[in-house]
Structure formats: C-alpha cells, structure tokens
Amino acid sequence: VPLIAGEARSDIVRDVSNVDSSPRNRAPGAGSHRTPLHALSAADSAWLRVDRDNNRMIITAVLTLERGVPFAKVQARLVDRLLPYPRLQQRIVTPKFAFGVPHWEDDPDFDIARQTEVVKLDNPADQSELESFVGGLMEQSLPVDRPLWRIYYVEKYVEKYDEKYDERVTAGGRTSDSSSAGAALVVRVHHCIADGIALLRILLSLSDEPPEITFPTAAAEWARSGKRASIARRVALGARTAARSIAHFANFLVSRSDPDTRFSTPLGRTKRAAWSNPIALEDIKQIGRASSGTVNEVLLSAAAGALGRVLEEDPQFESGLELRGVVPVNLRGDEPLSALGNKFGLVFMPMPVGIADSEARLEHVRESMARIKASPEALGWFAMLRALGRVPTWMEALGVELFSRKATLVITSLAGPKQQLHFCGSAIEDVMFWVPCAGNVGLGMSMLSYNGRVRLGVTADVGQLNNPAEIASEFESELRGSTSAGR
C-alpha cells in the first residue's frame, strides 16, 4: 500500500498569467517595477511539489515578546526588514504544460496588510492556547494568490511554565493591560521560498540589533580546501565524492525500512504543536564536558531518550530499538542570503530510542555522528532533492515514499544568538521553530538555543501522537537527569 495518498499537490500554485501585474497597493519601500519571471530552482521546486494536504511543507516559527508592540509598528518593521528580499514579494505561477517549471512572479497586489493578521486568543493567552493555535495553523495551506508566507501578531500572550527549573524566567505576574502584557509573532513560510537556516537568519534580522550569526556548514571545509587546491585536484575530489555518494545510495536503497511503531500509521490532517520549558545551555555543556560529547550530541541523545520513553508502552517497543531521524545539514556556507532558496542536504541519523542508559545512548549517538561527518551523505541527498524537483510527478512520489519508509521523524538542532534581542523596543524572550515533515513522516523535533537557553519544539500528527508535549516533557527529564548525574 503506498504511503503517499493521491497525487502531488496542485492547488499550491495556479496559473496567473492573465492577471494584471501593474504595480499597485505596494507596501512602502517595496519596488514598483516588475521583474522578469524567474524559474524555481530544482531544489525549491522539489519542496513545492512534496507539499500535501495532510503534510504541509511550511516552516513555522514563534518569537515571544516581553511587551506588546503597536501593530502599525510591527508592520513597519516587517516592511523595512523583509521586503528588501524580492522573493518575499513574489507568488508562484504554475506551468501551462505538464513538463513545465513553476516560476516566481511579482505579486501585483502585494500589500503588507495581506500578509499579516492580528490574533486575539484568551485574555491573556498562555502557552497552551498558543500551542493550540500554532498546531491549527500547521493544518492549513497558505493563500496561493500571494507570496507563500504569513505572519500573525498574537496579542496579550503570557508564558506560564515551571519557574523552578530556570529561576531567571518570570512565569506570569503580568496584568491584562496591553502595556504590560506580552505578545507573540507566529511566522509561516513555505519551504520552497527558503530553507530553515536562511529563514532563521531573516527572522532574527527583524530585531533592533540584527546579530551576526553563522551556522555550521558541511560545505565549509570542502570550500576552504578547494581554495587551496588545484583545479585538477578539485575535479578529482568531486569525482571521488560522486562515486562515494553513488555507493552510499546503493546501500541506502537496500537497507531496511524503519521498524513499525505508532509513527508508522497513515497521516491525517490534524496536527499538534508543543514546546519544552527552557533548559540552561550551560547545563547541557556540562553534560557534554563530563562525557566528551558536543552540545549537539547531547541534545540528540536526549531527544532519542525522550522518544523512547514515549514509545516504551507500545507493543512494538523493544530494548535496543533504533529509529532513523532525518537531519537537515547546512550547505549554504557564507554566501549572501539575498536570493534565499534551499541549499541543504539530509542525513539519516540512527536514533537509539531503545537504549535507556543515558551514557550508552550518548556514546551511540557520538559514534553515529562520527560516521555521518565522514560520509558524503548530505551532498548526495542535496543532489537527489534537485533531481526530484525536475522528474515527472510519479517518480517524485516514489522518491518521497522511499524517504517515508526509511525514517520515522525529522530532527534538527540550531545554535541561535547568545544574547537577548529586541523587537521594536520589546525584549524577545524566546525563539522557537518547527520543521515540516514530508511523505508519511509525521513527527518533527526542532531544538534551538537562544540567550543561553535551549528549547525543543515538537510537532506531531494527532493520529500518531495526540499530545506532543509528552516528548517535550520527557526531553526535559532526560537532560535534568543527566545534569544531576554529572554533579
């Protein structure tokens, strides 16, 4: 039985070739000229095509603010910081022929008011209400007659979580007065516009003090060595990498599918979102120092342990169970972000969910990471994604089905700004994001550090996991237990 239900999404794009494209209702600061049609890159097209009714290919992020900001100021900041990127003012034109390529076109009706919305939840709204709102958004598509992004300004948001674990965080205590109540920005951007690295850097550029942030890249070492090497040496290196990639994919194709668990069941359309309490980054570093592990390895191990705790009551669970997590790997390097787009590969990370002992589990993760770093897997999958963006729909569906059978979740970890940022004078208290999933993969786990703390964001299909907060809670327990053991 195919894991992919139906054909590739067709409603995400439409033919707008006859729409009047004269510039009107443009936001202040936006260009008034029409740029020529520009074809989506192969990688961007791939992420557009894998969008499904039951698995939206949309990245979601949340920025929580200490104090509310007048909505007019919010819109003015968005115009100032986002509109210099032409892609964010463009919509997608579907090809007229079956084998055509979708294109970007300036939206003639672009207006920041059409891309933003004020949301009023409970007065004030707390984390549970915001989680419910975010989960509901994950079920929805984006309007296809405009750029594929949208930002919601949630009024009067007040976080409430366990104050004991991080005494530096104030839980509650605010009044419902708009001058003291907080707020939140919920950002949704379709994956075809840009990858998570690019979007995170753009979102953080909304701050009053845009930080200079760099992210680890698998291409960095190759690029550095390439500058020193001769052309012949670089060609030889590329040939060897290609040969290794082919061998790797051959092994991947004959490798086993992931074991059946509750996360193997078909997806529905209802999604849930949750996030953990903040965990002090210094505590995570302490765990790493005690076990010779990196922060990333500690986080991946804790995530595997949390997933194992949630699964241990399932009949399919057994000691030593291993599930694959798809990990995005940055290939962008230090190039400018003006063109946005998707420039990342994928690696399939063995997640030792069936190892209860935290030290043994961390050692397993460390060994797996060492093998992955020495392999060409990320570059190979980037090439595969580009191919999926150009092949016929039925071939793309087969590729996504293969992807679904070989993995159970998508998981990522990013290091954000070390200092607190501000948005229009209001402190940005936390930054969170959720990776989209593809095919029949319905579980996503995203870890991000910001201002000396780390949070885990979890998204899940309700048919596979009704309450993703279970994983978030177990993630905290794993790290607290490891911290206590190391002291």
Go through the PLM ranges and name each one.
Residues L3, D11-A43, V50-R52, R56-V441, ...:
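Soluble acyl-CoA-dependent acyltransferase catalytic core bearing the H(X)4D motif
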